[in-house]
Regions:
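Immediate N-terminus of the mature polypeptide
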Residues: 1-9, 41, 57, 69, ...
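Extended assembly-interface regions of large multimeric machines
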Residues: 1-69
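Flexible hinge/switch segments at interdomain interfaces of large molecular machines
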Residues: 12-26, 103-127, 165, 225-229
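Extended Gly/Ser/Thr-rich low-complexity repeat segments
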Residues: 41-50, 85-100, 184-191
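Carbohydrate-recognition loop of C-type lectin domains
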Residues: 61, 137-276
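Catalytic P-loop NTP-binding/switch module of NTPases
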Residues: 71-135, 139
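An aromatic-glycine-centered, glycine-rich loop/turn in mixed alpha/beta architecture
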Residues: 225, 245-327
Length: 327
C-alpha cells in the first residue's frame, strides 16, 4: 500500500525504479507576440488563457525578460498549474494580465515544447514496481525495453516485438496513461514517443557516470510506435427480463473486463496472466458472472468494425469499448 496510508509501496519502488511516483508536470509553450522592435516583456509577466479555449482561465508565466527583435516574435511561457488541466492547443490565445508597453496584450500558441503530464496514478506506479522486481535486466532483451520505457512519464505500458523479417530491429509499441493520451484511450503523443526514445537511449539517472548510462545495444534499430486503438462493439440479443439496472451492471462489467485485455509479449509477460483474446465465450462468461441465470440469445462481437467470434490482440492493438447494445 502507499506510504500515505502506512504502506511501503514507494519504499520498494525506490529500490528498483529509483523514483517516487511522477508528480504532475507543467507544460511549456512557444507563443507568438506582436509589438515594437526593442520592446521589453518583463520577467514574471503573466498571461491568462482566453475564454474561447478548452482550458480557459489558466495562468502562464514568462520566466526571463525578453526583448523583441521583430514586430512578430516568439517567447516561451510556462503553466503555473501542473498537469493536463492547463494544456494548450496550437492556435489557442492568451491575454496578458497587465499591460506591457509597446506589446500587444494578446498572444497565440504556436508550439508545445514541454508536454504537460498528469500525476502518476498509484496503480500504474504499483504495476511498474512489480514489473521492475519481476523482470530481470538482460542487456537489450524485450524485458529491458519495457523497463526502460517505464522511465518516461506518461507511459502506462509498452509492448516490444522483434520486427518481422528484419534483423536487429525492434517495434516498440507505447501505450499512454489515459490522462496523458491524445484521445483518452491510450494513444501517446509524438512528444511522449520522443521521451520514450530518450530513456531507451540513455538512462535518466544522473547519479550514474555518463559512460554507464547508455542503454540501446549497438546496431539495434528501435521503431517507437503508438499503440492502435480498436473499437469493440458488442450486441446482446434477446436478453430476457432486461431492466435499466441489469443493463447498467452488465455494461460496466463488460467495459471493465474488456479494457483489461492487452497484447501478450511472451518474452516479458507471465503466461498465467495471459489475457489477449476477446471472444463471444468471454462475453457470455462476464454476463453470467454479473447476472447469474441470465437468459439471452446470440452475441455479436465486432472489433475494428469487423465481425469476429474470437480476436487476439497482438503487437500494438488494444481494445476500446465503443458500444454495447441490447436488442
Amino acid at each position: 500500500e502507499p506510504e500515505s496510508i502506512g504502506g511501503t509501496l514507494e519504499r520498494f519502488g525506490r529500490v528498483k525504479l529509483n523514483r517516487d511516483p511522477f508528480s504532475a508536470r507543467a507544460g511549456e509553450y512557444v507563443v507568438t507576440v506582436t509589438g515594437s522592435i526593442g520592446a521589453v516583456i518583463p520577467a514574471q509577466s503573466t498571461f491568462k488563457s482566453d475564454d474561447t479555449v478548452i482550458n480557459s482561465g489558466k495562468l502562464f508565466i514568462l520566466d526571463s525578460a525578453y526583448t523583441l527583435v521583430a514586430t512578430t516574435d516568439s517567447i516561451t511561457i510556462r503553466a503555473l498549474e501542473a498537469g493536463n488541466d492547463s494544456k494548450l492547443n496550437i492556435g489557442d490565445t492568451l491575454t496578458a494580465t497587465a499591460p506591457i508597453a509597446l506589446v500587444d496584450s494578446v498572444v497565440t500558441t504556436s508550439a508545445e515544447t514541454i508536454e504537460p503530464s498528469a500525476e502518476e496514478n498509484i496503480e500504474d506506479y504499483r504495476e511498474k514496481a512489480l514489473d521492475a522486481y519481476r523482470l530481470e535486466p538482460q542487456g537489450g532483451a524485450a524485458t529491458d525495453y519495457r523497463l526502460w520505457s517505464a522511465d518516461a512519464q506518461g507511459v502506462k505500458q509498452s509492448y516490444p516485438y522483434a520486427k518481422t523479417g528484419a534483423v536487429n530491429e525492434i517495434n516498440l509499441f507505447v501505450e499512454a496513461t489515459i490522462a496523458d493520451s491524445t484521445d483518452v484511450k491510450g494513444t501517446p503523443s509524438a512528444l511522449l514517443l520522443t521521451d520514450v526514445e530518450e530513456v531507451v537511449e540513455f538512462d535518466p539517472d544522473t547519479t550514474r557516470p555518463t559512460y554507464e548510462r547508455g542503454r540501446r545495444p549497438l546496431g539495434v534499430i528501435v521503431n517507437f510506435l503508438p499503440i492502435t486503438v480498436l473499437n469493440v462493439d458488442v450486441v446482446i440479443n434477446g436478453f430476457v427480463g432486461l431492466t435499466v439496472d441489469i443493463q447498467n451492471a452488465i455494461e460496466l462489467a463488460l467495459i471493465d473486463e474488456i479494457n483489461l485485455v492487452r497484447p501478450f509479449v511472451a518474452a516479458c509477460d507471465i503466461l498465467d496472466e495471459k489475457n489477449d483474446i476477446l471472444d463471444s465465450n468471454k462475453i457470455i462468461s462476464i454476463i453470467l458472472n454479473t447476472r447469474p441465470g441470465s437468459v439471452f440469445g446470440a452475441i455479436v462481437l465486432n472489433v475494428g468494425g469487423v465481425p469476429y467470434n474470437s480476436y487476439t490482440f497482438i503487437n500494438g492493438n488494444i481494445p476500446y469499448v465503443n458500444s454495447i447494445n441490447f436488442v
